[in-house]
UniProtKB/Swiss-Prot annotation:
This is GRIP and coiled-coil domain-containing protein C365.11. Residues 63-88 have a biased composition (Basic and acidic residues). Residues 1-88 are annotated as: Disordered. Residues 73-188 form a coiled coil. Residues 216-264 form the GRIP domain. It comes from Schizosaccharomyces pombe (strain 972 / ATCC 24843). It is found in: Cytoplasm. Residues 1-13 have a biased composition (Polar residues). The keyword Phosphoprotein applies.
Amino acid sequence: METTVSAKNSLENENFLKEKSETVFLDEAAITKPPASKKKRKNRKKKKNNGPSEQFVGNNDLEEQRSGSIDSKDKEKPLDEKVKELENANKTLSDLVRRIQIQRDEAEQKAEIYNRDALNTKQEHLDIKKRLEKSDETVCKLKEENENLQDMLRNVGNELVESRDEIKELIEKQKVQKESVKSHESELSSVMSSEILPKASSDSAGSFEPPVISNISKELINKEYARNVLLQFLENHEHRDKILPILSTALDLEEVHQHLILKNLN
């Protein structure tokens, strides 16, 4: 806006200078014209040269010459003043033209700076727009990743809950199995102490020593113990139902295997 206003002012100043210069040139042309008093003086000189016969007329001419010279002196003064005024006006106009030219150059420089700044601002705007678009894309990706992580966390939480429930069930089953093993061990110890162990010791000529059954576990059972239990199971038909659970523990037998053994022996 500032550059356009300054350019408009410079154009108006140029038009004003043109009009002023035209008026100055017209005034100078008017000054260069010879005044009418000089013509009158020439005519008077001609009349004077005609001779003394016209003395009365000559006297009148002298009076007219005196009055004309006075008038010409009076007129020459304002002409000189006008010349000075015109010279001063020309000087003022030249100074004004120079100032206007300087203002015009400054306005052009400001316009160039303004255009350059406008281009830079436009480029910065485009760069900011691209950055915003990239930021929006990044935000969308982060939202998707966040949703995926939340889904994964929910799935992991559900799996943990299921695993915890399964662990609880396994612990309960293990407790039940331990209790059943303890009950079977106690029954077997009573049977072995009363009937099975004495007979087995007599058959093996006193070489068999009963193991410590109270501390039996699946990991600590050895081959000798498993062999002795198997022999006792085969020899004692009456107590097979009680010996079979301990035998299945020693040999890691499933219920299917237990039923198969009982079926074949019976």
